[in-house]
Amino acid sequence: MLAKIVRECYGKEISECRKEELYHALLTLVQKKAGEKEENTGKKKLYYISAEFLIGKLLSNNLINLGIYEEVKKELSDAGKSLTDLEEYEPEPSLGNGGLGRLAACFLDSIATLSLPGDGVGLNYHYGLFRQEFKNRKQMEEPNPWMNKDSWLIRSDKSFTVSFGGFDVKASLYDILVTGYESRTNRLHLFDLDSVDETIVHDGIEFDKEDVRKNLTLFLYPDDSDDKGRLLRVYQQYFMVSCGAQLILSEAKDRGCNLHDLADYAAIQINDTHPSMVIPELIRLLIKEGIPFDEAAEIVTNTCAYTNHTILAEALEKWPMSFIEEVAPAIVPIIQKLNEKINAQYHDEKVAIIDGENRVHMAHMDIHFSHSVNGVAYLHTEILKNTELHNFYTLYPEKFNNKTNGITFRRWLLHANPLLSSFLSETIGEEYKKDAEKLNVLFDYRDDKAVCRKLLEIKDANKKALASYLKQTQGIKLLDNAIYDIQIKRLHEYKRQQLNALYAIHKYLEIKAGKIPKRPIVLLFGAKAAPAYVIAKDIIHLILCLQRLIEKDRKVRKHLQVVMVENYNVTKAEKLIPACDISEQISLASKEASGTGNMKFMLNGAITLGTEDGANVEIHELVGDDNIYVFGEDSDTVIARYERGDYCSKDYYEKDSELKEAVDFIVSKKMQKLGDKTMLTRLYNELLNKDWFMTFPDYRAYVAAKEKAYADYENREEWAKKMLVNISKAGFFSSDRTISQYNDEIWHLSEGTK
């Protein structure tokens, strides 16, 4: 199969090819095979609009979905070549950052696998978020180029004009084929400008934020610490939705739509608030087609659905009207009319689209002018209904619904953990690959010692593979025979990497005092901090200082290791997750909408150590008290304390000598010798005088839960049982289930034509 492509491309055999030649040949093979698959088509089509799609490397995922992975692997192996080497050679697309983008990628996989006609719509970022480098124990940001001639991008001949205030631009469209597992294909549509100039980037990720023609799609989430950066974000968002809206209407017409019946031909899912301007833009385009304003607004409402991904007020975007007047003056009167319509109907400034400071509340517009509003975990949706969006819930109870997030098992089990996947197939059959709930069959083996022993062997092999990878890529030798305790996620105070760091200090001080743990402990972190998020970068600095401090300490380093993985991304997650023993899901209760890392860890046999937050609540319900470590205050307690406004972190600090010792250590002479005094002092003061995400109240319970997990780990037989229960109950968290629910209750798409 591959040999034929190699001969056609290079006139030689696989064994004679260089790595880049083989990669090009594999890319050609996959594009050819995917191109031969029928695309999902139907009268009604979904458009999943998102600012980010964290799709990860695509080579092996596509080979698996196309059903040719083993065949290609053997063909390469027979010629003395390694598919693993080619996987390492492939660049990872820089199109996303955290859970939002990874969820979107999982959803595209499931939409295609379920044979539903649905495409992603986003932007073709040249440098993505950034490539993270550590220098002097600090995060530094560098561009993260990924496009080359051997790219998954296929340039389309479609083009759309976008009118900004004062100038027009012509968008180009690139597609990435989305292969379904043993199914047909869909597309990820990515819009770009040919005029974007990568050479304007200098000194890390600095660039002229005002030259929109040259900078528009350079970076995901440009630094918003000043108005120029914030304005650029609005330019990006309007560019994305204007192109998307034009594409949607064009394709709907091609399928026979008269636009009055648009909702019968298109379903638009607004993924968080970044694509919100698609609502006024679609209304504007429908009015241009001769449809009256009120009817256009009704059509758009029946077509659009909104997914809320956050409980954090600062993440619900509110743009000054002056920004929209500058970027997209054509939609300003539309937004104003929508606001007048709402004000006349409800007479409540709390639900207005435009507030007293002349800011446009994107989430408010989404809720009023979408037919569905969903949260992404049971607890999250309940908090939206009862607290954060309660005013809207009283207006539109019928719109609110829950769709607990999910993950694609093709990537996070079949691809990331082939040892476990093969063992599961031998033990319970192959049905779980298409029907994840079939993993439940594994539960019947919980008392089978041979099965449990094999799970431990697989975990050990994956830990060795991770150790080898980190030695090769970062020069770090992980401790042998250790517990791997892992926290990998976007760096944010509410996710509370600072709590884990305080534990590392506590354990370091214990070992220094002669209290040696039964087994070595490796605390692994992976996280990027937004370039303008000062405290988040301070937390990374603290972790890197602890890493170095322990490396240098002969007494402690045999028993404790702190490691921050550089430039954490999907590829590194695929190495870390199968090797994990303890999954850190320690956000402040009520702040994490769902999380999906928790699901990936669970699927791969890690045991959750977490608060009752996001999807942790549902994991707890599924696995039971004995197979998860829950700690900390619940969401009701946290919400009540915020409402009272009486939290004082210093009270906890003064009353708990152990906590005080750990916090004070941040600014100790030892740490200041290793680190930046300004950064460490700023973080110390933030915790002592503010601690907005309540690290201190949960500290004692966190330490106790961690110690309990470490103690239980020593009973290997019982631990293997916990692993088995978690794996067997993970089927609920398949994104196939999530997408089926979206389709049954919101989109109402028919399966694509066979």
List where the protein language model places each region.
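A conserved ligand/cofactor-binding region detector
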Residues: 1-754
